[in-house]
Amino acid sequence: MRLVLLGPPGAGKGTQASLLSDALKVPHISTGDLFRANISQGTDLGKQAQEYMDAGKLVPTSVTADMVRDRLNQEDAADGFLLDGFPRTIEQAELLEKMLQDDGHSLDAVINYVVSEDVVVDRMLARGRNDDNEDTIRTRLEVYRNETAPLIDHYKDVLLNIDAEGTVEDISCTTLNALDK
């Protein structure tokens, strides 16, 4: 299965991706992990990403998309994947669709984890990370609403909305049931 995971920060995408990856036998591909791997391995793409990050700038879509393309071309992703953190914008969604079409594929589903902002704030504050204060969290949620939420409409034909306010196990079961797995 070829899947994209959507949802605000703190929705539990990473947790669910790990469980789904095991259940579906496909790799969990996180853009954060891709950045770290490319930078630590000193790849050309990693060096480009590092330059932008060192300058305090966002890594351009072209660099991120190239990292994703390289990862999707690895053997373990031949039969499917879970993408987490890409696409974040309509432009990136269109690039992903082109990448998949070039290989004769398309997305099977886009899983949108739905969770209230108050629950997100509570979850993220409970993590105890230094950069997780309520103002920062609400700013991240606003960025998500403005940039990533339009993908929900873009993917309406393959979108599965999943209530992400239950237990980890319940959310995982609901997701697998929605995928008929």
From Swiss-Prot:
GO terms for molecular function: adenylate kinase activity; ATP binding. The keyword Lyase does not apply. It comes from the Bacteria. Residues 30-59 are annotated as: NMP. Keywords: ATP-binding, Cytoplasm, Kinase, Nucleotide biosynthesis, Nucleotide-binding, Transferase. Catalyzes the reversible transfer of the terminal phosphate group between ATP and AMP. Plays an important role in cellular energy homeostasis and in adenine nucleotide metabolism. This is Adenylate kinase. It comes from Corynebacterium jeikeium (strain K411). The lineage of its organism: Bacteria, Bacillati, Actinomycetota, Actinomycetes, Mycobacteriales. The gene is adk.
